[in-house]
A protein has these predicted regions:
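Short, often N-terminal, low-complexity regions
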Residues: 13-14, 18-19
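Acetyl-CoA-dependent GNAT
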Residues: 27, 32-39, 43-49, 54-128, ...
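Active-site acidic-Proline motif in GNAT/NAT acetyltransferases
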Residues: 126-128, 132, 160-161
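Conserved GNAT acetyl-CoA-binding A-motif
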Residues: 146-157
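Conserved beta-strand-loop-alpha-helix junction that forms the acyl-donor binding cleft
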Residues: 156-166, 183-185
Length: 195
């Protein structure tokens, strides 16, 4: 392990946003505390799982179009799973909070599938906050921050046929770029260009 990788890991663990040079590429680490001006943002932990399960169970439409289920085990797995070739140091599983109340959950991968792209693996709103343009405001802040860190796009996958998700993401500037089969379920891979 090089001194750079251990130094990056240490800085990231304590929440610093720094720039590191690898050849000619500038890598700007994500500081999740800067993802929202309105809500406090923090990493979600195992002790938060019951709260996450409750919010997920209330979002019944989402689970009609995916193989995922809102269980403790699935959420714990989601907190740790990364795409092939991506380390846990590039994964951020966090919540947006209004005081003690969880407003939204997000799983964000830095540098997937390319270094200049951020990937939203999961985004779910607390139903109490839905229909009030809060989700759109959160996504707007996240996208703005990603642009400021040098990302050129944000990518995600929408479960094909899910009208709620399709409407939300297209309303927020994401365009389907291709379809992918994942375990027998069709996903619409969508992207929002930032440059």
């Amino acid at each position: 392990m090089s001194i750079f990788s251990s130094g990056v890991d240490i800085l990231e663990a304590v929440g610093f946003r720094e720039q590191f040079f690898y050849g000619r590429v500038v890598y700007t680490m994500i500081d999740i505390s800067k993802l929202s001006k309105r809500y406090s943002v923090r990493i979600l932990e195992e002790s938060d799982v019951e709260m996450l399960v409750e919010i997920c169970k209330q979002n019944t439409v989402f689970y009609e179009y995916t193989e995922a289920r809102p269980t403790r085990e699935n959420i714990l797995d989601d907190m740790k799973v990364t795409p092939p070739g991506i380390s846990m140091s590039d994964k951020y599983y966090f919540g947006f909070f209004d005081g003690q109340e969880l407003v939204a959950i997000m799983d964000l991968i830095d540098g997937y599938p390319k270094p200049e792209i951020a990937y939203i693996g999961f985004f779910m709103m607390n139903p109490t906050y839905q229909g009030k343009k809060i989700g759109t405001a959160i996504i707007g802040e996240v996208v703005e921050y990603m642009r400021d860190t040098g990302k050129t796009a944000v990518r995600l996958a929408i479960d094909k046929g899910n009208p709620q998700s399709t409407h939300f993401w297209t309303k927020n500037g994401f365009r389907v770029i291709f379809e992918a089969d994942v375990n027998g379920w069709t996903k619409l891979v969508a992207e929002r260009q930032l440059m």
